[in-house]
C-alpha cells in the first residue's frame, strides 16, 4: 500500500537539491577560476585552496590505482538508496532525521558526481591554525558531517522530542 509522498520524509528531498546546487556551484567556480594548488586567503585561518581528492575522507586510499573511484561510488549509491528508503518509511514530521538524511544524500551525490564526471572530488576549503592545516574539504563534506551529527544528536533526544524534532 502506497503512502502520499508528502506525508513521508521524502517531503524533505528539496533539501538534497539545495545541497547539490550549492556544492556543485561552488566546485564549478573553483574549477573555472583556480589553478590546481592555487590558494586565496579569505580570513585568518581560512583559505580557498583547489585540491583534487582521488580517495575518500582525508584522501584515504587516494594512491591505490583507480579502483577506489568505483568502490566509493558504489558506497555512495548504496547509502543514498538506503537513506531514501528510510525517508520514505519516516513521517514528514520527523524533521531532524529527515533533514539529516537529506544533507547526507545531497553531500554524497555531490561527491559522487565529481567522482564519476572528473575522476576525483574537488576540495577547496582549507581551515588552519598556525602551521597546522585540517584536511582540505568541500561543501558536500560539510553537509555529510552536519547530517551525521544530526543523526547522532537525534539518538540522544528523549523519545517524545524525537517524534517532533
Swiss-Prot record:
Record has Protease as a keyword: yes
Q: What is the lineage of its organism?
A: Bacteria, Pseudomonadati, Pseudomonadota, Gammaproteobacteria, Enterobacterales
Q: What does this protein do?
A: This protein specifically catalyzes the removal of signal peptides from prolipoproteins.
Swiss-Prot/TrEMBL keywords: Aspartyl protease, Cell inner membrane, Cell membrane, Hydrolase, Membrane, Protease, Transmembrane, Transmembrane helix
Enzyme Commission no: 3.4.23.36
Instruction: Identify a single GO molecular function assigned to this protein.
Output: aspartic-type endopeptidase activity
Q: Write down the NCBIfam families for this protein, in alphabetical order.
A: lspA
Per the similarity annotation, which family is this? Belongs to the peptidase A8 family.
Which Gene Ontology cellular component annotation is one that this UniProt entry carries?
plasma membrane
Q: Name one Pfam family in it.
A: Peptidase_A8
> Any idea which residues are catalytic in this one?
123, 141
Q: What is the membrane topology here?
A: Multi-pass membrane protein
Indicate the transmembrane segments per the record: 12-32, 70-90, 102-122, 137-157
The reply to whether tRNA processing figures as a keyword in the UniProt entry is: no
Would you kindly state one Gene Ontology biological process term found in this protein's UniProt entry? proteolysis
The UniProt entry, under InterPro entries, shows: Peptidase_A8 (IPR001872)
What is this protein's name? Lipoprotein signal peptidase
Annotated metabolic or biological route of this protein: Protein modification; lipoprotein biosynthesis (signal peptide cleavage)
Spell out the subcellular localization from the entry. Answer: Cell inner membrane
Catalytic activity reads: Release of signal peptides from bacterial membrane prolipoproteins. Hydrolyzes -Xaa-Yaa-Zaa-|-(S,diacylglyceryl)Cys-, in which Xaa is hydrophobic (preferably Leu), and Yaa (Ala or Ser) and Zaa (Gly or Ala) have small, neutral side chains
Amino acid at each position: 500500500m502506497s503512502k502520499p509522498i508528502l506525508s513521508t520524509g521524502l517531503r524533505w528531498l528539496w533539501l538534497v537539491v539545495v545541497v547539490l546546487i550549492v556544492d556543485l556551484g561552488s566546485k564549478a567556480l573553483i574549477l573555472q577560476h583556480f589553478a590546481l594548488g592555487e590558494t586565496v586567503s579569505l580570513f585568518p585561518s581560512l583559505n580557498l585552496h583547489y585540491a583534487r581528492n582521488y580517495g575518500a575522507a582525508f584522501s584515504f586510499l587516494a594512491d591505490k590505482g583507480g579502483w577506489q573511484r568505483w568502490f566509493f561510488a558504489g558506497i555512495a549509491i548504496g547509502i543514498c538508496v538506503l537513506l531514501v528508503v528510510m525517508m520514505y518509511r519516516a513521517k514528514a514530521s520527523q524533521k531532524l532525521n529527515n533533514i539529516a538524511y537529506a544533507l547526507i544524500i545531497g553531500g554524497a551525490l555531490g561527491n559522487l558526481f565529481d567522482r564519476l564526471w572528473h575522476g576525483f572530488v574537488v576540495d577547496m576549503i582549507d581551515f588552519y591554525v598556525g602551521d597546522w592545516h585540517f584536511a582540505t574539504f568541500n561543501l558536500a563534506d560539510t553537509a555529510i558531517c552536519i547530517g551525521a551529527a544530526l543523526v547522532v544528536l537525534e539518538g540522544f533526544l528523549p523519545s517524545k522530542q524525537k517524534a517532533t524534532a
